[in-house]
Amino acid sequence: MTVTGIIAEFNPFHNGHKYLLETAEGLKIIAMSGNFMQRGEPALIDKWIRSEMALKNGADIVVELPFFVSVQSADYFAQGAIDILCQLGIQQLAFGTENVIDYQKLIKVYEKKSEQMTAYLSTLEDTLSYPQKTQKMWEIFAGVKFSGQTPNHILGLSYAKASAGKHIQLCPIKRQGAAYHSKDKNHLLASASAIRQHLNDWDFISHSVPNAGLLINNPHMSWDHYFSFLKYQILNHSDLTSIFQVNDELASRIKKAIKVSQNIDHLVDTVATKRYTKSRVRRILTYILVNAKEPTLPKGIHILGFTSKGQAHLKKLKKSRPLITRIGAETWDEMTQKADSIYQLGHQDIPEQSFGRIPIIIKNERLN
């Protein structure tokens, strides 16, 4: 049986994700962000609910990306996720993209020219953000064209880099329905952005989200729930440069900006520059929120849930892979567990996120 990996946030899970799972082949293993997202935002609903939604709509196994993989720039996010999926025996990686191109060809380009491509990045002016530099690199070395906001396409290029030398097949699937950042409600396949924007429109949500009750009946989290905690951390911290990726310039900008900022958007807008993108600033503010220092990654792989078919695959791996199915007195990943505790502070109805939790088990492969 083909084993397909999918890297996801499911923030939240929606019909477009269901389409991706239905289109992908074989047994599907999801490497999913935990309670904080790649662009530096708290998850709308917690990781256990999102895992359950995925397992009820075509996923066979859901594993958790550690905090220092989840909350990273595209290249590190892709590398960390693919490393985990390869340990779980994937043969191919499926992903949605705005532009279906020959990603396999791009893997070969990077395998042959990675040193030259990396060296080229260092020649570009510092006024460009890293994503802008990366786009120029792919344009020069592989002729890739970019148009508009295509975040999934850019992630696909990061997947190509991370797949070099790993002998896995990349399987791009054309994104259906609304564009990634679209707030348009007039789509059966509405975007996650539109769903987050219209959470109070239950009719829209029920048509856009499979098992919509899981979304509707659980706390909806955003930066608004954590901004006061963040403000305390910034004002009370004696040396922000001890936080991961915070340099002197950013520390100064953040310390000044927090005094006049009433919400996260104002703070991000005030701190961001051409060099420091808004996504990067949001990630750094997330690092400050959870007091993240130098990154370390766990050896174990945390299993959030599985179906009967997924369980059979895990049984084949358990003797040769460090699979974690319950976090007890011995920690899995200290940073992720600390981030979970802070996430839980945002709402009294969020249950324990780490200690004692066991995987979600769906006995029937698919419950639509």
Swiss-Prot record:
GO cellular component: cytoplasm
Role: Catalyzes the formation of N(4)-acetylcytidine (ac(4)C) at the wobble position of elongator tRNA(Met), using acetate and ATP as substrates. First activates an acetate ion to form acetyladenylate (Ac-AMP) and then transfers the acetyl group to tRNA to form ac(4)C34.
The family this protein is said to belong to: Belongs to the TmcAL family.
Binding site for ATP: 7-20, 96, 152, 175
Lineage: Bacteria, Bacillati, Bacillota, Bacilli, Lactobacillales
EC number: 6.3.4.-
Gene Ontology BP annotations: tRNA modification
Superkingdom of source: Bacteria
The name this protein goes by in its record: tRNA(Met) cytidine acetate ligase
Entry keyword set: ATP-binding, Cytoplasm, Ligase, Nucleotide-binding, RNA-binding, tRNA processing, tRNA-binding
GO molecular function: ATP binding; ligase activity, forming carbon-nitrogen bonds; tRNA binding
Annotated Pfam families: HIGH_NTase1
InterPro entries: Rossmann-like_a/b/a_fold, tRNA(Met)_cyd_acetate_ligase
Protein's cellular compartments: Cytoplasm
